[in-house]
């Protein structure tokens, strides 16, 4: 799964609004760092060891599995947007830190 930091997303949208073609569709994603959800959860645990967090995985039942697609990775082609000059700037780990710091700051207010 591709994760894209909100500032990169906004920059991409503005890039399309200013320089994109009217009838074109543009894929916006940070495909440089695809992660599985479990890896994102573990990264969060690793970033904040002082919190004592733990990731627990469970194997879904056959009924639940039927609701999931069988393929693992779908990569969006972002080359059209990149040809306008856009590229993601914030890596997943940095974006997670910024997001958590923002939540902490908001809770203190």
Q: Predicted regions span which residues?
A:
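C-terminal substrate-binding subdomain of Rossmann-fold SDR/epimerase-dehydratase oxidoreductases
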Residues: 1-109
């Amino acid at each position: 799964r591709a994760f894209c930091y909100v500032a990169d997303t906004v920059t991409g949208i503005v890039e399309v609004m200013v320089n994109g073609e009217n009838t074109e569709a543009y894929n916006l994603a940070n495909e440089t760092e695809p992660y599985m959800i479990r890896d994102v959860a573990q990264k969060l645990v690793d970033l904040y060891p002082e919190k004592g967090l733990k990731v627990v995985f469970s194997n879904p039942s056959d009924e639940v599995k039927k609701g999931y697609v069988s393929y693992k990775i779908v990569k969006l082609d972002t080359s059209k947007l990149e040809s306008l000059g856009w590229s993601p700037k914030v890596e997943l780990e940095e974006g997670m830190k910024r997001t958590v710091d923002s939540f902490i700051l908001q809770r203190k207010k």
